[in-house]
C-alpha cells in the first residue's frame, strides 16, 4: 500500500512539474514575442494596416493614430501618434523598417510618437536618418525635437556606439500636388483647405489599387475629389452632441461649450458616410473614433444610412486592405 502511495505521489509530482514547465515555456514564448528581434515585415501586394486607431484622448486599448501602407518590404507610416513603438511591435514591424513617415498635419495627436520612433528605432539599430515628409510646420517641429534631444542623443550614441545618422531626421516640407515614387509605390499629396493649419491628405497606388488616408475634419469636397474611386479611404469620425442635445439627458459634461468647438474640428459620424458616397469609394475604414465605439454595429448602422459600401471599424493592428 505504501508503495502505491509513493508511486501515486511521484505521478502527481511529475504532472505538477510538467504543468509548471509548460507554463514556463509559454511565458518564455510570450516574452520572446515582446523582446526578440523581428524579421523584416513583408507583403506581396499593396496592404494597409491600422497600427494605431485612437484619437487625441488617452485610451489604453488604442494607440495614437498611425496607418501603415506596405508594399513588399517598403513601409510608409501616415502620422505617428503616441505609443507608436508598441504599436509597431504588436504589428510585427521592426522599428527601423519604415522607409518614410508622412504627416497629415502637425497637430499633437499626429506627431507625439516621432521622438519615440526616432530614439527607440535607433536602438534596433537604424543606420540612416529617419525620413519625414509633411506640410508647412513639419520642419520647425523636427528641428525643435532634434534640439531638445541633442544632449541625450549624443550621450546615448557615443555610449552604445550607434551610427550618428540613425538618431537624426531628414525632413521635407511639401504642399498641394507633391508626388514621389518609392519602390513601386506612387505617393501623392493634396492640400485640404479650411482648417486652422496646413493639412494634407495622402494617396498611395501600386498601379492596381489606390488608398487614401486623411485625418482632418475640413476640406471635405477636395478630399472627396482626391479620393474619387479609391479602393479604400481611411478617415476619422466623431459623434459630438450639441449642448441642446445634451439637455435633459442627465449627462454631465465638464465643458459642454467645447463640444461645439470640437464638432467643427472633426468629421461627424453622421457626415462621413456622405463623404464616402460622394467619393464613390469601395471601402471606408474608420479610425480616430470619438467616442471609441462600444459596439461596431452601432457605428456601421449610423454610417450605412448614407453609404452602401463596406464599412470597417478598425482596431489597432488590423489589416484593412486587401
State what each model feature region is:
Residues 3-9, 16, 210, 218-317:
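Cap/insert and terminal regions of metallo-dependent hydrolase folds
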Residues 2-212, 223, 298-321:
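Binuclear metal-dependent hydrolase catalytic cores
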